[in-house]
Regions:
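C-terminal catalytic "cap/lid" subdomain
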Residues: 2-124, 128-303
Length: 303
C-alpha cells in the first residue's frame, strides 16, 4: 500500500510560526470524546482524567481565556447506569427511544460529575444542549450566540453536548467532532482542540501502512485529504472517526479558526498546546468568504 500525498507544511520555520501564534488565542473550544472519558476495561467514567481535564480548563480561564467544553459521554454513562450493553439488541423495536432514555439518564449524571469537579476549582459551569435547529434557525442561532456571550462575560465555562434526548435524524448533528466545530464558529472562537484516541492526522492509516507519515501542519484542506477520512471509523464507544474530524476541520478553518487534533491519553497536552509546543496536527484557519455556517449545517446529511 502506497502512502498518499497531501498538501502539508514541512518547513520548520513555518511550523514554529503557526505554533507560536497559539499562545495568543483568546477563545478556545475543547472537545473530548466518549472513549477518552471512560476506562476501557469497565466502561465506567475515568475520574482521574475528568479531574485533569477540568483542572486544565480552569487554568485556561485563570489565564484570561474564554473556554467552551464540548463533551461526549451522556449515552454511554446512561447505558452503564441502567445496565444496557448494546442498545441495538436490547430493544430492537425502538432503539432510538432506548438511546434517548439513556441520554436523559446519562446527561444528568455527567453534568453532576462535571459540576462537582469544577466546584472544587471554584469555577462555575453551565450546560448547553444543542440540535441542528439551534444553528439553522436564525432566531435560535442568535439566542444561542447571545447566551454564550453572556456566559463568557460572567466567567462561566459552558459545557455543550448534543440534545440526544430529543434529537432525531432530521435535527441531529450526529457527532461531537462536528458539533464542536459548529460551536467554535458560532461563538467566534480562534482555536478548536479535538482530544481523541489518536495522535493526529497521518498520510494513511498507520495501523495498516508502516510507511504512513504523521502530518504536523495542514495549510489547505484539499479534496484528496478530505477523501482520506471517508473510510475511517470511530471507536465502539464514540460516533466519530477521522472523517468527522476532517469535516470539523473544514468548518473550523473555513471560519478562520485554527484546529488541532491531539491524543487525549495525556490531558495535560492542553496547556502545552497553548504554550506553542508541537503537539498533534494543526489545521490552519483560512477564512473562506463563500462559507455559510447555517447552510452547511442544514445540508450536512445531504453531502
Amino acid at each position: 500500500m502506497e502512502t498518499r500525498k497531501v498538501k502539508e507544511t514541512k518547513d520548520g520555520a513555518d511550523v514554529k510560526r503557526f505554533r507560536e501564534r497559539l499562545k495568543d488565542k483568546k477563545k478556545i473550544v475543547v472537545k473530548i470524546g466518549s472513549s477518552s472519558l471512560q476506562h476501557s476495561e469497565t466502561g465506567d467514567l475515568d475520574y482521574t482524567k475528568l479531574d485533569v481535564l477540568v483542572r486544565e480548563l480552569c487554568d485556561m480561564r485563570n489565564r484570561g481565556k474564554d473556554v467552551v467544553l464540548v463533551t461526549s459521554g451522556a449515552i454511554a454513562v446512561g447505558k452503564k447506569a441502567v445496565n444496557i450493553k448494546d442498545i441495538k439488541h436490547e430493544e430492537e423495536d425502538n432503539p432510538i427511544a432506548v438511546k434517548q432514555a439513556c441520554a436523559a439518564v446519562g446527561q444528568a449524571r455527567l453534568m453532576m460529575t462535571y459540576q462537582k469537579i469544577f466546584a472544587e476549582y471554584n469555577q462555575v459551569a453551565a450546560q448547553i444542549l444543542m440540535t441542528k435547529n439551534t444553528i439553522v434557525d436564525n432566531l435560535n442561532r442568535y439566542n444561542a450566540h447571545n447566551t454564550f456571550s453572556e456566559l463568557f462575560k460572567l466567567g462561566v465555562i459552558p459545557i455543550v453536548n448534543e440534545n440526544d434526548t430529543v434529537a432525531t435524524y432530521e435535527i441531529e448533528i450526529g457527532d461531537n467532532d462536528t458539533l464542536s466545530a459548529i460551536v467554535a464558529a458560532l461563538v467566534d472562537a480562534d482555536l478548536l482542540i479535538l482530544l481523541s484516541d489518536i495522535d493526529g492526522l497521518y498520510t494513511d492509516d498507520p495501523r495498516q501502512n508502516k510507511n504512513a507519515q504523521f502530518i504536523e501542519v495542514v495549510e489547505e484542506l484539499t479534496d484528496e485529504l478530505m477523501d482520506m477520512g471517508k473510510a475511517s471509523t470511530g471507536s465502539s464507544v464514540g460516533t466519530g472517526g477521522m472523517n468527522t474530524k476532517l469535516i470539523a476541520a473544514k468548518i473550523a478553518t473555513s471560519s478562520n479558526i485554527d484546529m488541532i487534533i491531539a491524543n487525549s491519553k495525556d490531558i495535560k497536552v492542553l496547556h502545552r498546546i497553548l504554550d506553542g509546543k508541537n503537539i498533534g496536527t494543526l489545521f490552519v484557519g483560512n477564512k473562506e468568504t463563500y462559507f455559510d455556517l447555517p447552510e452547511f449545517v442544514a445540508n450536512m446529511h445531504n453531502n
